């Protein structure tokens, strides 16, 4: 009987003292491809989608086309080059990690402009 109790106690101690080795999952890095964002720019509510190839389309929520071009991540910045203007590349700060749908952040451009951007469900846009 004593052997059974000691053996049971030893097994319980071993089972309870095993450290949890599961590592905490590292959050995914921020990415642009296949994402859609909403924001208000100069009083216009805008929806912007970036496809898998890094092409973006920016439309007013009412459907009016505003801009399109190429988007690329450069470090912690999202950089956009419009196919419609001669402004050149404009880069904005981004969070370090991916945002879930419904989450927002304030992006700051290289020119010092600030914009509150909200991630929404991916919606491929067409011109």
What residue ranges belong to the model's regions?
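Lipid interaction determinants
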Residues: 8, 17-68, 74-127
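Positively charged n-region of N-terminal signal peptides that target proteins for export
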Residues: 1-4
């Amino acid at each position: 009987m004593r052997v059974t109790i000691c053996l049971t106690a030893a097994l319980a101690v071993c089972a309870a003292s095993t450290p949890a080795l599961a590592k905490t999952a590292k959050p995914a890095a921020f990415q642009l491809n296949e994402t859609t964002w909403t924001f208000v720019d100069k009083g216009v509510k805008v929806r912007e989608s970036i496809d898998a190839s890094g092409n973006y389309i920016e439309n007013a929520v009412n459907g009016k086309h505003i801009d399109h071009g190429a988007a690329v991540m450069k470090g912690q910045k999202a950089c956009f080059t419009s196919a419609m203007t001669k402004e050149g590349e404009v880069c904005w700060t981004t969070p370090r990690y991916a945002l879930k749908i419904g989450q927002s952040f304030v992006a700051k451009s290289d020119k010092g402009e600030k914009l509150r951007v909200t991630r929404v469900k991916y919606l491929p846009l067409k011109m």
